Amino acid sequence: MKKRIGIVGAGTAGLHLGLFLRQHDVDVTVYTDRKPDEYSGLRLLNTVAHHAVTVQREVALDVNEWPSEEFGYFGHYYYVGGSQPMRFYGDLKAPSRAVDYRLYQPMLMRALEARGGKSCYDDVSTEDLEGLSEQYDLLVVCTGKNALGKVFEKQSENSPFEKPQRALCVGLFKGIKEAPIRAVTMSFSPGHGELIEIPTLSFNGMSTALVLENHIGSDLEVLAHTKYDDDPRAFLDLMLEKLRKHHPSVAERIDPAEFDLANSSLDILQGGVVPAFRDGHATLSNGKTIIGLGDVQATVDPVLGQGANMASHAAWILGEEILAHSVYDLRFSEHLERRRQDRVLCATRWTNFILSALSALPPEFLAFLQILSQSREMADEFTDNFNYPERQWDRFSSPERIGQWCNQYAPTIAA
């Protein structure tokens, strides 16, 4: 008998899982409250970059609509402010790519439906889960909407924060000239905030995502509270002023006459994220085990761009485990966690560490930045390992590991 899988949520996790399962003729139904043709009128959903490991999965799923060789980027520029600013660059071994999710998500939804996946357009609440679980061999929850996240118990040891660590201002902009190499820029203004600049394909072609991770109480926090719609010119002037002061390596490429939101006033998000890590399964009152996937298991701040990439990874692993098993109980969830947890948990821990380190600036982290800025080999490793958060956590998980890493690359610094 053909397996039947129910998926609640049509984000990257749910849709990558659905597409994987349809490749293996598994019956899939996705529950979502949005139809594909509704996305174009939505506010910006996020500013997500897909690293090469995720692009490879998209190739395998035959949904690589925008090849990274044409639309992607090839490395990271870094800027560290202070009395002696540091500028340096690191290469990616294979390009990453960012596409406006208002284009990307409906493409995935249409691909899934074209391949025989079913879609049910409706809200799903916690009260619906038990009934849905009876209809499928396995129910997978991929969204925290409507309190669905509370079904999965939060792990306090992996959820150190009770409130947002940054006041976010995120938008898609035009009027920013590309750097000599199409690349992300990661700019750090000590004590004030971080900026991640991401070349991003949107409705009108290539644009620039600016992810401003403003420290709460800093000179930059005002950007998270000033509304574009109240006075667009005043907002843009404030943004330019703050970028020139805190993130000059980006500001110097802006044409003030052209600088604006890329498409419309819907191209901006402001607010904050409370990072959390939850159990990857829950047992309902009817005895059925359900699986949590993507953001509902691991919610991370966007500073390192790990959310969608670890969600896609976990979806692929879950798909393989669904194929390998026929009973989806607590023991199944243990098999799943054994395979997916290292990357998902390391992405969470690494992101949380960086949030804290960029605020507190402990001496071992400052030493890391100094060596990183002078060793191209170290910068290349650090940059490419955005694909592999478990490798990053191997480097950052203790002061001793950071010190050993710095000692490894110190001899590579040019005299």
UniProtKB/Swiss-Prot annotation:
InterPro entries: FAD/NAD-bd_sf (IPR036188), StyA_sbd (IPR041654), StyMonoxStyA (IPR054801). Keywords: FAD, Flavoprotein, Monooxygenase, Oxidoreductase. The gene is styA. The keyword ATP-binding does not apply. Belongs to the StyA family. Its EC number is 1.14.14.11. GO terms for biological process: styrene catabolic process. GO terms for molecular function: oxidoreductase activity, acting on paired donors, with incorporation or reduction of molecular oxygen, reduced flavin or flavoprotein as one donor, and incorporation of one atom of oxygen. It catalyses: styrene + FADH2 + O2 = (S)-styrene oxide + FAD + H2O + H(+). Homodimer. A direct interaction with the monooxygenase reductase component StyB seems not to be necessary for the enzymatic activity. Styrene monooxygenase which catalyzes the first step in the aerobic styrene degradation pathway by enantioselective epoxidation of the vinyl side chain. In a two-component system, StyB reductase utilizes NADH to reduce FAD, which is then transferred to the oxygenase; the electron transfer is proposed to occur via a diffusing flavin. This is Styrene monooxygenase StyA. Pathway: Aromatic compound metabolism.
